[in-house]
Curated annotation (Swiss-Prot):
Any one cellular-component term (Gene Ontology): extracellular region
Major location category of this protein: secreted
InterPro entries: C-type_lectin-like, C-type_lectin-like/link_sf, C-type_lectin/snaclec_domain, CTDL_fold
Disulfide-linked positions: C2-C13, C30-C127, C102-C119
Protein family per UniProt: Belongs to the snaclec family.
Function: Potent inhibitor of collagen-induced platelet aggregation. It acts by binding to the integrin alpha2A domain and blocks collagen binding to integrin alpha-2/beta-1 (ITGA2/ITGB1). The gamma/delta subunits mainly contribute to this activity.
Name of protein: Snaclec rhodocetin subunit alpha
Pfam (any one): Lectin_C
UniProt organism field: Calloselasma rhodostoma (Malayan pit viper)
Domain of life: Eukaryota
Keywords annotated in UniProt: Disulfide bond, Hemostasis impairing toxin, Platelet aggregation inhibiting toxin, Secreted, Toxin
C-alpha cells in the first residue's frame, strides 16, 4: 500500500504538493519524499486522466499549471525528451512548439496539454513512485 497522503493506481503511488518550486527543486523534493520517487511521469492516456483528476481534487479545480517529470536533455547535437524517472516515452500529449526545456501540464480544458516552461518558473507539482513488487 501507498504511504499516508499518497493516492494509488495499479502499482504506483502519487502525491500532489501545493508548495510552488522550480522544476529542479520539485524533482529534488520528490526524491527526498520516498525512495525512487520522482516528478510524475505518464505512460498512457488513462494515467494522464488519473493524474489530472488527483490534481484537480486536491486543488479544488483552481490549478492551471503543474510540473511533470518530462524534460529536454541536450546530448551533443541531439535533444532527447526524457522522463526524470527513466520510464519510456510511450505516450505524448505535447503542445508544440516547445521553446523551453521543462514540461508542465496545463489543466485549463479537457485533457491537459503538456507545455514547456522556463525551468526556473515556480509551479505546484506531483511526485510518483512505484511500489516494490
Amino acid at each position: 500500500d501507498c504511504p499516508d497522503g499518497w493516492s494509488s493506481t495499479k502499482s504506483y503511488c502519487y502525491r500532489p504538493f501545493k508548495e510552488k518550486k522550480t522544476w529542479e527543486e520539485a524533482e529534488r523534493f520528490c526524491t527526498e519524499q520516498e525512495k525512487e520517487a520522482h516528478l510524475v511521469s505518464m505512460e498512457n492516456r488513462l494515467e494522464a486522466v488519473f493524474v489530472d483528476m488527483v490534481m484537480e481534487n486536491n486543488f479544488e479545480n483552481k490549478i492551471y499549471r503543474s510540473w511533470i517529470g518530462l524534460k529536454i536533455e541536450n546530448k551533443g547535437q541531439r535533444s532527447n525528451l526524457e522522463w526524470s524517472d527513466g520510464s519510456s516515452i510511450s505516450y505524448e500529449n505535447l503542445y508544440e512548439p516547445y521553446m523551453e526545456k521543462c514540461f508542465l501540464m496545463d489543466h485549463q480544458s479537457g485533457l491537459p496539454k503538456w507545455h514547456t516552461a522556463d525551468c526556473e518558473e515556480k509551479n505546484v507539482f506531483m511526485c510518483k513512485f512505484q511500489l516494490p513488487r
